[in-house]
């Protein structure tokens, strides 16, 4: 086998449609566009979501809710994620160094999901009641 002899398998590639090249091609004259109308014209067509003048769905439905800007700087951390952090003292900088949270995160909260297998000291993070109990039962402590 040589690079200059490689070719696609037989029947794997289809010839492109050549529209407007005579009636024998099956796509002559109107080229598969039908007669007249906006979609038959060059550059013709309607925008996405256009329903022919009827009030479109995206305008019939009400607006609701918003995205809190706090959510971009806040993270939830599972107890199982603490396994990725080196050292016994875990704070926001340690979480960032271990790539558990992104660099833009300013606040983090530990939640009870998974389990912690070693005694760790949590410093400067928010902790749920369940996570607090799990950390303390593993011999760890929480410093505010």
UniProtKB/Swiss-Prot annotation:
Segments for region (Disordered): 1-53
InterPro entries named in the record: Ribosomal_uL15, Ribosomal_uL15/eL18, Ribosomal_uL15/eL18_sf, Ribosomal_uL15_bac-type, Ribosomal_uL15_CS
One GO term (biological process): translation
Molecular functions per Gene Ontology: rRNA binding; structural constituent of ribosome
Domain of life per record: Bacteria
Keywords: Ribonucleoprotein, Ribosomal protein, RNA-binding, rRNA-binding
Xref: Pfam families: Ribosomal_L27A (PF00828)
GO cellular component labels: cytosolic large ribosomal subunit
Keyword rRNA-binding on entry: yes
PROSITE patterns: RIBOSOMAL_L15 (PS00475)
Gly residues bias locations: 21-31
This protein's record includes keyword Methyltransferase: no
Function: Binds to the 23S rRNA.
Family to which this protein belongs: Belongs to the universal ribosomal protein uL15 family.
NCBIfam families associated with the record: rplO_bact (TIGR01071)
Subunit structure: Part of the 50S ribosomal subunit.
Name the record gives this protein: Large ribosomal subunit protein uL15
Protein source organism: Proteus mirabilis (strain HI4320)
């Amino acid at each position: 086998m040589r690079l200059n002899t490689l070719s696609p398998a037989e029947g794997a590639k289809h010839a492109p449609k050549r529209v407007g090249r005579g009636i024998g091609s099956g796509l002559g004259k109107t080229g598969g566009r039908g007669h007249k109308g906006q979609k038959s014209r060059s550059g013709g067509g309607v925008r996405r979501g256009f329903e022919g003048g009827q009030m479109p769905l995206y305008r019939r439905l009400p607006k609701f809710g918003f995205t809190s800007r706090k959510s971009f700087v806040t993270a939830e951390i599972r107890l199982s994620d603490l396994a990725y952090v080196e050292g016994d003292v875990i704070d926001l900088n340690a979480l960032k160094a271990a790539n558990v949270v992104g660099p833009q995160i300013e606040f983090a909260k530990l939640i009870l999901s998974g389990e912690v297998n070693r005694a760790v000291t949590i410093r400067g993070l928010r902790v749920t009641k369940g996570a607090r109990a799990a950390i303390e039962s593993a011999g760890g402590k929480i410093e505010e």
